[in-house]
Design a protein with these regions (language model features):
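Acidic, Gly/Pro-rich loop/turn segments at junctions of secondary structure
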Residues: 41-136
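Short secondary-structure boundary segments
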Residues: 61, 85, 157-158, 175-176
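Hydrophobic hinge/microswitch elements
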Residues: 127-171, 178, 217
Length: 226
């Protein structure tokens, strides 16, 4: 039956900034289950899977808008302040969160990442308001802006890791991790779980931790800190 063999259309949705992260998993799943036709939609919002017909939605919002939805935790994500070596040569290296007040802190205009940068300091915290020298709603554009020396970008660790490893960016104020949150796969509850949905979620749970660990290992390597 359809619930035993993975086949048919698998409609996936994830935040725009996670598209590049997930593509190796999409390709790997496609190799395992070639009868499944994958439709991956990227956008800057959290859709309603029931209303919009998505089989699985990747989201950082674990709040279930509907009791007919199930959320499966996939791991934790975080963001880190980064800047290009050229920017730091010109403007100096912030040694403490308070030093960011004198820097061009670029703004993400995207609900998941919007707002102040909050650095916990014991019982207190340092709050930095990004300025309006540049804003974008896509993490990949923020990555390029940071690489080009436009200022300091607060980037998801998986977005920044390759540029950090290759020397195009330096991680600042390590080991601070900002915007730590859990990632979920959300899907409509059914009496039985369709094989393509079940196998995709199992594949995510199996593969994502190692993928996250690889990216985190790079950004947590003190050789790449400033």
């Amino acid at each position: 039956g359809a619930h035993l063999t993975p086949r048919g259309h698998l409609r996936l949705h994830c935040p725009h900034g996670m598209g590049l992260l997930l593509m190796p998993l999409v390709a790997g799943y496609n190799t395992l289950y070639p009868e499944v036709v994958i439709e991956l939609t990227l956008s800057q919002r959290n859709p309603d899977p029931l209303a919009e017909g998505h089989d699985v939605v990747i989201t950082v919002d674990g709040a279930l808008p509907d009791s007919q939805l199930i959320a499966v935790p996939l791991g934790n994500i975080f963001s880190i302040p980064c800047a290009a070596p050229g920017y730091l040569d010109t403007h100096g290296v912030p040694e403490r969160p308070e030093d960011l007040h004198g820097h061009r802190c670029l703004r993400m205009a995207y609900p998941m990442y919007e707002g102040d940068w909050v650095f916990p300091q014991g019982v207190d915290q340092c709050v930095i308001a990004p300025n309006d020298s540049f804003s974008t709603n896509v993490a990949d554009a923020m990555l390029v802006a940071s690489e080009l020396g436009m200022g300091i970008g607060l980037l998801p660790f998986y977005t920044a890791s390759e540029a950090i490893e290759q020397g195009r960016l330096r991680r600042l104020l390590a080991p601070y991790r900002l915007r730590e949150s859990a990632l979920y796969a959300m899907y409509p509850s059914r009496h039985y779980l369709d094989a393509k949905v079940r196998t995709w979620i199992d594949y995510l749970k199996e593969q994502l931790p190692a993928l996250f660990e690889g990216h985190a290992r790079v950004v947590d390597d003190a050789r790449y800190w400033r």
